Regions:
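Active-site metal-binding core of divalent-cation-utilizing nuclease and nuclease-like domains
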Residues: 137-142, 433-461
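Structural motif
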Residues: 147, 463-465, 499
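Mg2+/Mn2+-dependent nuclease catalytic core
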Residues: 167-173, 471-488
Length: 521
């Protein structure tokens, strides 16, 4: 077996990865393609921890003319002229959770770092004037056009996207900072911005009306992340090593990795793309886990779900027009663009006749991790007991012991605090939906039948469960409705034994009072 390189988990600097001989999945053909396309200003949107910062760092080393770092990579054979350019590299990643004054100081400090490099001792006052001065100085001192790289350009704004008043102040600060990039165009060789969202109305993109958004271009669909082909070729030995450690065949290992971390597509024509952060962590630790979610769940997403009153069962399969992806983030009427840009749903299909995209949750890691993060909205807290309860419920349901699973859920709900929204049947429906989704089973709500809608359908590997939920009634009433409406007939051809489940919740105790379970024959 080939000697394996160490994995650059959490390392986002291209030069360090190469000089330390860590694993690098070669993206330099994309670097060459973009820098020789004739354009100057480019923008790329990708989810967090998807390799954007490493890509920016790769551009930096390339434009600094560090040819020795690219030995053996695709660009070594493509690039004939390794010209060194002055590079201004800014990261906005540290500009989160700030007010207006603090953000202005943060930008000032980032500018001061560059001013020190270029010997500017008496900088201007305003951030935009200082950026202009930096570009002019670098251009005049070197006689070469300047490269500007801005990583996570939208980081200062994402946490306040749900706060209209606060967003306006911070947006004006950032707009002022970015505005020189258009006026300085003759002095610029290349401008590259990365982020999660496209703040169309932020005036960054109206000021930079010549910027090329490559986020959904099929030529760049695989520029970040790890494609299926890259996994099976550049990381082939790593897959074999993981298979040995997990006691699986190579094919089983690839299938398991695909189930957990694959499924992303960023264009109508896109290769299968794996989440790089989770994939590298899984390789490094020889264990599949929910690495992307444990690295942080953005609070802005949870707040936006609340703002738009999005139910957990609404997240998932949907259709969208191309224009929907460009909806201004701060003027959204739907949360779909933010869910897509943040990586919680992704492109799963495209119909060229209607020009409609089909989107859905990409993989098991996102599905389970997302619903885990939403669970506190329905049980009022995050608790280790909740995690262990759900794990035990999963084991019971796999054994077709729904009675035991509901007993466990009833006992758990008796220990959690009151939740303000727990006064409607819909609340309990969504709570059950979230819990069963965390168990990684197929679950759907309000499923149509010829005679009505089934509150919830749960499909496991061995059984199909039809749930009818009641509030302040009894389980017998729920079971009566299932029989009266003849819901099971709709699923007779499912190929699985059908189990009817009637559950009643009590608004006073916020818990299950009783349930009935019957096999359909």
């Amino acid at each position: 077996m080939a000697e394996l390189k160490l994995y650059p988990v959490g390392i986002q600097t291209f030069e360090e990865i190469i000089t330390r001989n860590l694993l690098y999945v070669d993206k330099t053909e994309y670097v060459y393609r973009m820098t020789h396309s004739g354009g100057k200003h480019f923008f790329l949107s990708r989810p967090r921890r998807f390799g954007k910062s490493l890509l920016v760092s790769t551009f930096k080393s390339y434009f600094q003319g560090k040819k020795e770092l690219f030995k053996g990579l695709a660009i070594e054979k493509l690039e004939k002229d390794w010209t060194e350019y002055p590079v201004l590299h800014f990261s906005m990643a540290g500009g989160k959770h700030m007010g207006k004054d603090q953000l202005e100081r943060y930008l000032g400090n980032r500018l001061a770092e560059q001013e020190k490099v270029w010997g500017i001792k008496t900088p201007a006052v305003d951030a935009n004037d200082r950026l202009i001065s930096l570009i002019q100085t670098a251009y005049e001192k070197t006689g070469k056009q300047v490269v500007v790289l801005i990583d996570e350009y939208d980081a200062p704004l994402l946490d306040v996207v749900h706060e209209d008043a606060h967003l306006k102040d911070l947006r004006n600060v950032m707009r002022n900072f970015y505005s020189p990039l258009k006026d300085c165009e003759p002095m610029l060789r290349f401008v590259f911005l990365t982020g999660i969202t496209k703040f169309s109305q932020m005036s960054i993109f109206s000021e930079l009306n010549n910027i090329t958004n490559i986020s959904m271009d099929h030529e760049y669909a695989g520029i970040c992340g790890i494609t299926k082909e890259e996994l099976e070729t550049q990381m082939s030995a790593d897959v074999d090593a993981l298979a040995v450690k997990m006691n699986l065949t190579r094919a089983q290992t690839l299938d398991t990795l695909r189930e957990f971390y694959d499924g992303y597509h960023f264009a109508a024509q896109s290769p299968d793309i794996f989440n790089p952060y989770s994939l590298l962590n899984a390789m490094a630790k020889s264990k599949l886990d929910y690495y992307w979610f444990t690295s942080g769940t953005p609070t802005y997403l949870i707040e936006m779900l609340k703002k738009f009153q999005v139910m957990p069962s609404d997240i998932g399969r949907c259709e969208a027009d191309k224009s929907d992806f460009d909806a201004p983030t701060e003027m959204m009427v739907s949360i779909m663009p933010l869910l897509y840009q943040s990586g919680y749903i992704t492109i799963k299909g495209y119909d060229p006749e209607t020009e409609l995209f089909t989107l859905d949750i990409p993989n098991k890691e996102i599905r389970v991790g997302l619903y885990r993060s939403l669970l506190p909205n329905y049980i009022g807290m995050t608790t280790p007991k909740g995690t262990t309860t759900i794990a035990k419920m999963s084991a019971l349901i796999r054994r077709n012991d729904m009675d035991g699973a509901l007993q466990m859920l009833q006992a758990f709900l008796a220990t959690v605090p009151y939740c303000n929204q727990a006064d409607s049947e819909g609340h309990y429906q969504q709570m059950m939906y979230v819990i069963f989704s965390i168990l990684d089973n197929y679950v759907d709500v309000e499923v149509r039948t010829p005679s009505g809608r089934v509150d919830m359908v749960l499909r496991t590997a061995t059984h199909l469960y039809l749930f009818e939920l009641k509030l302040n009634k009894d389980a017998a009433a729920a079971m009566k409705q299932i029989d009266l409406k003849e819901y099971p007939k709709r699923f007779a051809l499912s190929g699985l034994p059908i189990v009817k489940v009637g559950v009643n919740f009590d608004i006073a105790t916020h818990n299950i009072t009783d349930w009935k379970i019957e096999d359909y024959t």
